[in-house]
């Protein structure tokens, strides 16, 4: 087990793939704690001892490391008299599994539920200076027994492993579902009444990536049309801090109609501190700045080609189109991924693998520029249906300039 602790030209390409892999890591993972305790039965806690048992929702806030931007959620079980203090965590995976990276990219990573000591769970968050908020749940003895039975069932070898899904089945949604199932009444969220319902998955991702423009760009490069769909209030709860906020005002409507708050008390289990880790060294230019800079270079070289050297700069087309085509192979792979909202991604018309054929030094076709223009037109049209990553339209203008120049020359 491990803790998800999540341009010379060749160098820049390597940096790009590094950025997109980090984006995958941070986008499709939440932080996790390792070193699970030996399998134990929560049923060992007697009914008489349940009075001293406290069940809490733990929300671990983001810290400065990129992989933590979405936070983490777990359930704490504290026996104040028996001394047992553990955390139930659905964020554990085994990176030593065969072909782990292959399965990870395709969204076929299996996560598992594990129980760790609270001290061990908090250690990493203390190191990074991350705040951990505890919401003690307002549960009856019967509800405590029920949630322990549910957790006991999940801890069985045949049940503890699950297929992780960032939006719909992650460490936060699992904790929420267990808690809601254990309550004898219906859990209602008054906070939902104030929500307009016009927030998309991409909006949430952007909010969590604030201050990290290249992470935001990497996520937007990978995310397709599905991420621009409006979320329901419950779907927003895939983010730990969203669930924490909803739980703050949530209430349980019992069978007799009486209402009680879901959360009995909220406290800071681990205060935010000074991180002992080095801050992430970001690239000095934003994605938009890089796209504008590239556009200026393309315009300058195209003008130089026409008015100064009067010779074709063929290497510019090969470099520009073929690099984008190579990067587009990643989007092709994502078409077969189980990760949510990545299969239909209209940015593939910009990062188009067909560029590798159309703009190969060994390929000659008189209709090449017309075909390229058609592909690029589909990309621009896609703005209606999908929110593109920062700088993508500017990058497309660089291609359009080269296509129109070549098209004009071929018609002369």
Identify the function of each model-found stretch.
Residues 32-36:
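Boundary at the C-terminal end of the N-terminal hydrophobic targeting segment
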Residues 63-64, 130-138, 157-166:
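Second-shell loop/turn segments in exported
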Residues 153-367, 377-412:
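Activation targets extended, charge/polar-rich intrinsically disordered C-terminal tails
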Residues 6-9, 20:
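Short, positively charged and aromatic/hydrophobic N-terminal segments
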Residues 18-29:
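Bacterial N-terminal signal peptides
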Residues 142-151:
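Short, charged, amphipathic alpha-helices and their helix-cap/turn boundaries
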């Amino acid at each position: 087990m491990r803790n998800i602790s999540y341009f010379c030209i060749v160098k820049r390409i390597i940096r790009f793939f590094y950025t997109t892999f980090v984006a995958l890591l941070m986008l499709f993972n939440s932080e996790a704690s390792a070193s699970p305790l030996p399998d134990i039965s929560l049923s060992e806690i007697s009914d008489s001892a349940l009075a001293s048992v406290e069940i809490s929702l733990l929300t671990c806030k983001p810290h400065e490391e990129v992989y933590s931007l979405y936070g983490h959620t777990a359930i704490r079980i504290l026996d104040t008299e028996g001394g047992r203090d553990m955390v139930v965590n659905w964020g554990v995976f085994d990176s030593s599994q065969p072909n782990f990276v292959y399965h990870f990219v395709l969204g076929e990573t299996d996560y598992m539920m594990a129980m760790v000591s609270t001290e061990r769970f908090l250690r990493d968050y203390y190191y990074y200076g991350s705040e951990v908020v505890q919401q003690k749940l307002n549960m009856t003895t019967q509800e405590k027994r029920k949630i322990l039975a549910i957790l006991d069932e999940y801890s069985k070898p045949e049940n503890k492993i699950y297929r992780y899904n960032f939006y719909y089945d992650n460490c936060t949604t699992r904790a929420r579902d267990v808690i809601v199932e254990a309550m004898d009444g219906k859990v209602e969220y008054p906070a939902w009444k104030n929500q307009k319902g016009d927030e998309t998955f991409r909006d949430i991702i952007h909010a969590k990536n604030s201050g990290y423009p290249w992470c935001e760009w990497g996520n937007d490069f990978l995310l397709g049309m599905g991420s621009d769909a409006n979320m329901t209030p419950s779907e927003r709860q895939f983010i730990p801090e969203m669930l924490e906020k909803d739980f703050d005002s949530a209430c349980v409507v019992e069978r007799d109609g009486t209402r009680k708050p879901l959360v009995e008390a909220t406290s800071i289990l681990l205060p935010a501190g000074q991180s002992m880790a080095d801050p992430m060294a970001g690239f000095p230019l934003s994605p938009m700045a890089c796209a504008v800079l590239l556009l200026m270079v393309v315009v300058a070289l195209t003008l130089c080609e026409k008015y100064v050297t009067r010779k074709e700069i063929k290497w510019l087309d090969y470099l520009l189109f073929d690099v984008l085509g190579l990067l587009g192979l990643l989007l092709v792979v994502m078409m077969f991924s189980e990760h949510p909202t990545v299969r239909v991604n209209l940015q593939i018309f910009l990062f188009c693998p067909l560029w590798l054929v159309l703009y190969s030094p060994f390929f000659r076709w008189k209709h090449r520029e017309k075909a390229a223009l058609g592909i690029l037109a589909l990309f621009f049209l896609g703005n209606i249906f999908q929110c593109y990553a920062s700088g993508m339209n500017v990058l497309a203008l660089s291609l359009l300039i080269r296509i129109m120049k070549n098209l004009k020359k071929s018609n002369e």
